[in-house]
Design a protein with these regions (language model features):
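Face-selective signature of the C-terminal outer-membrane beta-barrel domain
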Residues: 3, 292-316, 342-488, 511, ...
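Short acidic/polar hinge/loop motifs at secondary-structure boundaries
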Residues: 64, 143, 169-195
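Outer-membrane beta-barrel signature, preferentially recognizing the C-terminal barrel domain
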Residues: 346, 451-454, 494-497, 525-579, ...
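Surface-exposed extracellular loop regions of Gram-negative outer-membrane beta-barrel proteins
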Residues: 209-224, 263, 267, 291-295, ...
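Short, acidic Ser/Thr/Gly-rich low-complexity loop/linker segments typical of extracellular
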Residues: 45-60
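Outer membrane beta-barrel strand-and-loop segments of large Gram-negative receptors
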Residues: 398, 407-411, 456-458, 553, ...
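Short, acidic, small-residue-rich periplasmic hinge/interaction motif at the N-terminus
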Residues: 40-42, 75-79, 91-130, 149-151, ...
């Protein structure tokens, strides 16, 4: 840690004599602010570069401790550069004039996504670029460097699933990305090393900002999507809002239907006193539908203060799943049994509720951001396994599992200018109460009732200061957690615990000519989910059970990262050390070694290094995006049967192309390829990839849009993995119902984005639930 602090201090050296601060704003000739303009300081002696920055969304810039008499230069594509000699003045107003000779070139290059490095991450400008024409926010995120589209969401490479904010408000429902139109998005920022103001369990953040809401009156948009694969899926949404002066009312109502088909082949080898091997094939079908509702209100008290409320009420229909599992079992290489298992599963849900209250304001020079959340959900899970055995006794196993979750969370953040920088202080509090009961009438596994209560209070502080050649940000977060575990109504002292941790963070961002760089360190954590902590045992088959582990420790993660950007080229490298890494594991039943119990355990450490190289130029109507990613871990895994060296890197490549033909026609082609390698306690044993193509045509001045899309055209999105645990080796090959034809129709009338500014609290805790 001391060495890292020394490196960061050296990274920021270079203070000048006769220095003072200089700030100002850059406008065009119509007095509109110009964001992302380059503002640099040059030496008066030889015009060498000293320090530089880019303007914020409001056109503002700020330099601390610059030398008087040097030259300030402001420039932006399509405008004549502006220069002035620094004198004893502040709050400069700079007006850039259009460069008539460059206007034609600007028309050609104006579609290029514009990237810039911020004090937290890398921001991609969407407004007035080709990305604003893609359709939805989902489509935009698939084209943002550093983000990878996965089956169930998005991933920041080397960090995992990010927390997503829209206008500072925590995203609660993934369908918000489907409902948000690309034409309403201003920018997307990817933060791969979050600071202290975020929960320590948050390892990556995506911040989406929309264009400023304008105009009064009523507006709505309707979106209908039809998905045809082996099954039919539907997504139907209507969004509305009414705005009058300082008041805004808004709502969203939608229905989605998801049908799935998931075939797989699995082999498990268990080496105890007998060598057991199971080879089974599985065919699973599912049906899931839900009706979602969101309503809310926002009131602007004045130009600096607003309050709001949002309420979400969802009505999930019964989740229905059926499967056929056919397995052959051998013992020491000799045939033991053939078992056909017919499984049915029904999940019944109570309506889930979520409410958010917020206040965002300013009193004098102090910024205030307060949020309070409440969440409730409940589900019942009834499963029946009918096992038909050729050589042994056939049997039927039923189970009932009930879960109920309640969460209360709040967060307060205060910001104030201090010593030429900005100081943010605050605290976040969460309280969770989870009840989890499991019963098996046939007593093949024990019935139990668990209750988990956890409280977490986390004060934090963060300070930002502009030095002569870098922006320095330092933060500290302290989290105190109290966890109580109850089983069958009795408090279990040895599985309950209290602990506290400090999570420091520090980063430095600078610009040298056109090269932008950022070096950062952050300590994070990963907390086990409540299912991973539950001691309840669930039935898989007569050879396989699953349960949590109340003795799991939290991970403590050290991350160092370096990012750089030059024009349309981005590069990043990071080192990650996960102490007490949480992984899947297996244990054998003490009474019958043929029965394995899947659970979780902690490994001492998993160290990884991740790299990223991205290119995103614009060539006429064509905008290609190429990204190469590599992740390599160092892990020597010791089991009771063997020692494994799991050090082979995983490579991932993506190549996206967008063609803007004009007159409302847009063609998009996306592809990716993942190569085999090692990950945690296993390996990816099958290369996989996908090719998607979409064509969009807009009508009626972009109010009506028709889109045709084909996903996974060659049906190559197949996964294969192998895992190694204490006495068991498991290999699985899975195929997804991913080849689809999608038809989407969108109509919008008098629409503009919501002004709602609630950010929410306790999001990491919601994810654990």
């Amino acid at each position: 840690m001391e060495k890292l602090l020394l490196i960061l201090l050296l990274f920021c050296t270079g203070l000048r004599a006769n220095a003072q601060s200089v700030s100002g704003k850059v406008f065009d000739e119509n007095k509109k602010p110009i964001p992302y303009a380059n503002v640099i300081i040059l030496s008066a002696k030889d015009s060498t570069f000293i320090v530089g920055t880019t303007t914020a969304d409001d056109g503002s810039f700020n330099f601390k401790e610059v030398t008087l008499g040097n030259i300030l230069k402001a420039s932006f594509v399509g405008y004549e550069p502006f220069t002035t000699v620094l004198s004893n003045q502040d709050n400069l107003t700079i007006v850039l004039k259009e460069d008539a000779k460059m206007m034609k070139e600007v028309v050609v290059k104006g579609n290029a996504p514009l990237h810039k490095m911020t004090t937290e991450g890398i921001q991609t400008n969407i407004e007035n670029t080709i990305l604003s024409k893609l359709g939805t926010c989902e489509d935009v995120l698939a084209h943002v460097p550093g983000l990878t589209k996965k089956k169930d969401g998005y991933e920041v490479f080397g960090r995992g699933t990010p927390i997503i904010y829209i206008n500072g408000r925590q995203m609660r429902d993934a369908t918000e990305l489907e409902r948000l139109k690309s034409s309403d998005i201003k920018s997307v920022e990817v933060i791969s090393n979050p600071g202290s103001r975020y929960n320590a369990a948050v390892r990556a953040v995506v911040k989406i900002r929309t264009k400023k809401a304008v105009g009064d009156g009523f507006g709505f948009d309707v979106r209908s999507a039809y998905y045809q694969s082996e099954n039919v899926d539907l997504s139907e949404w209507v969004n509305w809002k009414y705005r009058h002066k300082r008041l805004e009312l808004f709502g969203a109502h939608g229905y989605s239907l998801d049908n799935g088909h998931y075939p797989s082949k699995t082999t498990t080898v268990v080496q105890t006193d007998t060598l057991w091997q199971q080879d089974f094939t599985q065919e699973v079908t599912q049906r899931n539908s839900i009706f979602k509702n969101t309503v809310g209100a926002d009131y602007q008290l004045n130009d600096s203060n607003s309050v709001g409320i949002k309420y979400m009420l969802n009505f999930p229909h019964d989740f229905l799943l059926s499967g056929i599992l056919s397995s052959d079992v051998t013992a020491n290489g000799t045939f033991y049994d053939h078992i056909n298992t017919f499984a049915t599963r029904k999940l019944s849900y109570r309506p889930s509720q979520f409410i958010n209250l917020y206040y965002v304001g300013k009193i004098g020079k102090m910024d205030i951001d307060f949020n309070a959340d409440y969440l409730y959900n409940k589900q019942n899970d009834h499963t029946t396994y009918r096992e038909e055995s050729r050589n042994k006794v056939s049997r039927t196993v039923t189970s009932d599992n009930q879960e109920r979750n309640r969460l209360i969370a709040s967060k307060l953040t205060l910001g104030y200018p201090v010593l030429g920088g900005n100081l943010s202080v605050g605290a976040e509090y969460t309280y969770t109460n989870r009840n989890d009961t499991y019963s098996n009438p046939e007593n093949y596994v024990p019935s139990s009732a668990a209750q988990l209560k956890e409280s977490n209070i986390a004060p934090f502080m963060e300070y930002k200061h502009q030095l002569s050649i870098c922006q320095l940000t330092a933060g500290l977060r302290w989290e105190a957690v109290r966890f109580n575990y109850y089983e069958n109504g009795q408090h279990i002292a040895n599985q309950s615990r209290s602990f506290s941790n400090l999570f420091p963070s520090i980063s430095a961002a600078t610009q040298i000519g056109g090269l932008q760089m950022q070096l950062s360190y952050a300590a994070r954590t990963r907390r086990p989910s409540y299912r991973q902590l539950s001691n309840n045992v669930s039935y898989g088959n007569r050879f396989l059970m699953q349960s949590g582990n109340p003795l799991l420790q939290h991970e403590y993660i050290h991350n160092i990262s370096l990012g750089a950007m030059w024009k349309f080229i981005q590069f990043g490298i990071s080192y990650n050390d996960r102490r007490h890494a949480i992984v899947f594991w297996s244990e054998q039943d003490s009474h019958n070694s043929a029965i394995s119990r899947i659970t979780n355990t902690n490994l001492p450490s998993i160290k990884t290094i991740s790299t990223q190289l991205a290119f995103s130029p614009t060539i006429g109507i064509w905008t290609p995006e190429f990204t190469a990613l590599m992740k390599k871990q160092w892990l020597t895994l010791h089991t009771s049967t063997k020692t494994y060296k799991l050090n082979k890197p995983i490579w991932q490549f993506s190549f996206n192309n967008t063609f803007d033909f004009g007159k409302g026609w847009l063609l998009s082609m996306e592809s990716y390829y993942i190569k085999r390698g090692d990950a945690e306690i296993g390996s990816v044993v099958r290369n996989s990839g996908s090719v998607d193509i979409s064509l969009t045509k807009s009508f009626l001045k972009d109010r009506l849009a028709l889109r045709i899309r084909g996903t996974d055209l060659f049906h190559t999105r197949k996964e294969g993995g192998i895992s190694y645990t204490e006495s068991m080796e498991t290999q699985q090959i899975s195929t997804y119902d991913s080849r689809q034809f999608v038809l989407t129709v969108t109509y919008k009338f008098n629409t503009s984005r919501s002004k709602y500014k609630g950010t929410g609290a306790g999001q990491a805790e919601k994810n654990r639930l």
